[in-house]
């Protein structure tokens, strides 16, 4: 179903649909008049003699060079072609769809000075499935995501390469097969297309959506691990968390209580348990995962604002003046990406400690070593835990902030940059690692719960276990394990594990 975008107020939920489901997007037609007004203003400047950056001047360090009106189209074409300097593998289709949609939103605010023809072409590319081949590397996140967005714009001109119906084609051929016509860029249009944070923001949004899904799944596996270890639910008591006051912590504790409600395992050790306190990885889940939830919610707000922002330069303001600024600088996105990386790292770190607890017979309160039915003859989940440790450590390495590593570019004209693009891109690998860690915890926790038979877990966790066991059977004896890990990770990544429990139990991104 096509999503109608209202620039300035597009909610994260719509952007998530574009990312997860590839839904096309169009601008609400009420924004057409504002787009046309700004385009007319730029056309008037281009026809005159007043120098305005990007309209009739060179770019970056070459901004002082005046360009003749007769060379306007050549200027914009040269800009795009010269900036197609991306390297590396192509970004995934759902990321590129998000980039195109974010560019629609920015242009739709009516401050960029592009013609409606450009807007309609982007809409048609989304509808028909013409997906520009955008290399993953080459942006420093200021002045905008120049190289990635140049590859997008080049396809609109009939240059570069694009995917259409699964085939990689020259840009012009891809457009032709979709029944579309390349555009000849008018004054400032090339600059408007590439001067923006849409690539960084799309990658950061992808990281956010994936991190939130993993965070929700981690509450399910964390609750399951709590039951498998016969851990206490007392630390999840509401009053404890209300006394501290952090919203994420309060919501996380509520989710854990709901997930464990009705567990016979939990009831069995309410009285007479000689253990006074559980290890932190069980007891402090609300404090750790709740803090991560708060971080994700903060970044969600930042990225929702950025998704609706005009990050072009110069801008056509409400009084028709055209003013140069710096909205292309992606520092807010870079900070958000760094915060998401920290949350992803910590969700995985505490989950890995729960995995380690369950496979250690000195900590697991009666479970066999490595959750093997015949330890010694079988190694059980020994190396699955080692894999989770490797993934956790890799994420720790990647969690180093990207935003603090500025370097001057473009002959020192662009002397401070955000590094938002690769800071956001690493979130794809980090969340892939996190999906696998949470998948491994699902395997260890479910195996541990089954060892507690005839005692049973809660109805909600039982539904999650049934979802897991539909694709990964109980480990009766050693077998080729890689498919088990892949299947469990896929349940986290595709949302099946989250979808297995009742709606409303797991916390959303709203509420901060």
Curated annotation (Swiss-Prot):
CDD domains xrefs: PAL-HAL
Record GO biological process: L-histidine catabolic process to glutamate and formamide; L-histidine catabolic process to glutamate and formate
Enzyme Commission number, as recorded: 4.3.1.3
InterPro entries: Aromatic_Lyase, Fumarase/histidase_N, HutH, L-Aspartase-like, Phe/His_NH3-lyase_AS
Enzyme class: lyase
Cellular location(s): Cytoplasm
Keyword set, alphabetical order: Cytoplasm, Histidine metabolism, Lyase
Keyword Lyase included in the entry's annotation: yes
Cited HAMAP family: His_ammonia_lyase
Protein's recorded name: Histidine ammonia-lyase
């Amino acid at each position: 179903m096509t999503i109608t975008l209202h620039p300035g107020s597009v909610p994260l939920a719509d952007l998530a649909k574009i990312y997860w489901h590839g839904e096309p997007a169009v601008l609400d037609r009420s924004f057409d008049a504002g787009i046309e007004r700004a385009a007319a203003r730029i056309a008037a400047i281009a026809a005159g003699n007043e120098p305005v950056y990007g309209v009739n001047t060179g770019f970056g360090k070459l901004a002082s060079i005046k360009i003749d009106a007769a060379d306007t189209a050549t200027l914009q074409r040269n800009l795009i072609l010269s900036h197609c300097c991306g390297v590396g593998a192509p970004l995934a289709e759902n990321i590129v769809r998000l980039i195109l949609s974010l560019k629609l939103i920015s242009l739709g605010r009516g401050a960029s000075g592009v013609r409606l023809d450009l807007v309609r072409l982007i809409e048609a590319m989304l509808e028909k499935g013409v997906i520009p081949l955008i290399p993953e590397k080459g942006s420093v996140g200021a002045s905008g995501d120049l190289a990635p967005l140049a590859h997008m714009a080049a396809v609109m001109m009939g240059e570069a390469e694009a995917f259409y119906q699964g085939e990689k084609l020259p840009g012009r051929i891809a457009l032709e097969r979709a029944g579309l016509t390349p555009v000849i860029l008018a004054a400032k249009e090339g600059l408007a297309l590439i001067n923006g944070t849409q690539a960084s923001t799309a990658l950061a949004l992808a990281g956010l959506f994936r991190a939130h899904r993993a965070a929700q799944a981690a509450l399910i596996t964390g609750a399951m691990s709590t039951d498998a270890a016969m851990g206490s639910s007392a630390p999840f008591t509401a009053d404890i968390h209300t006394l501290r006051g952090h919203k994420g912590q309060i919501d996380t504790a509520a989710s854990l209580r709901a997930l464990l409600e009705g567990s016979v395992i939990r009831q069995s050790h309410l009285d007479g348990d000689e253990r006074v306190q559980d290890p932190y990885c069980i007891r402090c889940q609300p404090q750790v995962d709740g803090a991560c939830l708060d971080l994700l919610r903060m970044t969600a707000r930042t990225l929702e604002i950025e998704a609706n922002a005009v990050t072009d330069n110069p801008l056509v303001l409400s009084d028709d003046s055209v003013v140069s600024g710096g909205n292309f600088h992606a520092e807010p996105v870079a900070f958000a990406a760094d915060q998401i990386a920290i949350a992803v790292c910590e969700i995985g770190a505490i989950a890995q400690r729960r995995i380690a607890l369950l496979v250690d017979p000195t900590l697991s309160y009666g479970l066999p070593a490595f959750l093997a039915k015949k330890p010694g003859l079988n190694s059980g989940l020994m190396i699955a835990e080692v894999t989770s440790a490797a993934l956790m450590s890799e994420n720790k390495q990647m969690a180093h902030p990207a935003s603090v590593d500025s370097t001057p570019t473009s002959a020192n004209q662009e002397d401070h940059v955000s590094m938002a693009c690769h800071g956001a891109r690493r979130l794809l690998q980090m969340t892939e690692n996190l999906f696998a860690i949470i998948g491994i915890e699902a395997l260890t926790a479910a195996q541990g719960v089954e060892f507690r038979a005839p005692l049973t877990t809660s109805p909600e966790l039982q539904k999650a276990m049934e979802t897991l066991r539909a694709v990964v059977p109980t480990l009766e004896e050693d077998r080729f394990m890689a498919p088990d890990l892949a299947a469990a990770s896929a349940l986290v990544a595709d949302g099946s594990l989250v979808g297995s429990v009742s709606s409303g139990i797991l916390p959303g991104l709203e509420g901060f």
